[in-house]
Amino acid sequence: VEVTRAVAEKLGVKVEFKETQWDSMMAGLKAGRFDVVANQVGLTSPERQATFDKSEPYSWSGAVLVARNDSNIKSIADIKGVKTAQSLTSNYGEKAKAAGAQLVPVDGLAQSLTLIEQKRADATLNDELAVLDYLKKNPNAGVKIVWSAPADEKVGSGLIVNKGNDEAVAKFSTAINELKADGTLKKLGEQFFGKDISVQ
């Protein structure tokens, strides 16, 4: 929200936010119910890349592995046979399963971290920004990030528009680059996530 406000201010336009469910967000953009999607979207699938365009990234995120503060888990290799709290339909759940983890089904990150704290699960593989947000809001959670995906596996999130809006993408990208250059994106990342998330 804050990045979108800063971009709108740079462009001299008024922004109206419409909250929607994740599952209907891209369909709403495609149908013209929204002009822009600004919700940590990376456009990684070929289907989305064929339908939508993305501005320069305003944030970067990748997978992180979270375990209790006293855990011996240090990497994905360590979760083989280990109880790992995951949403069964997520990419992270698939990645944990492929690593040989024993999946404990959950509805989301907060439940995953609660199960780890309660020693009903040992780890979770999840999105870095979601975890950083949780840890910023819950500094005494008793869990920590024990492994992070390398920079070349991180995905950049930008402002998303329907394909063919080249002028909008160019304007958004210029504004985002200016916000990087003047330190605004770094400041927002540190304020909300405890670190600069504007760089890969």
Predicted region positions:
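Alpha-to-beta junction loops
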Residues: G12-K14, K30-N39, K83, Q118-A130, ...
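Hydrophobic residues within well-ordered alpha-helices
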Residues: V7, L29-K30, I79, I116-E117, ...
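Extracytoplasmic small-molecule ligand-binding "clamshell" domains
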Residues: V1-V41
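Flexible hinge/capping segments at coil-to-helix
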Residues: E56, A67-T84
